[in-house]
């Protein structure tokens, strides 16, 4: 059976949004927004791994309760200057992992 992967670009700084923290780390229902998105993907039985593309200097990721999401998460700190670059970098990291 083929493996399916999710790739979540989360390297943005949210500078246009104007908040003190990147918008993926803003809280909703007591948890960062990114937690809710990742939890939904981790619950999906068809997805083998959830790759999260983060910026190299991401200071907020360590605060996310990722252990409660199980072992599917694969954070990679290779975000680019744009979302497209982050996705390309994440796909390259995933491709290298699978090679």
Model-based region annotation:
Residues 3-59:
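N-terminal glycine-rich phosphate-binding loop and ensuing alpha1 helix
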Residues 35-99:
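Conserved N-terminal catalytic core of the sugar/cofactor nucleotidyltransferase
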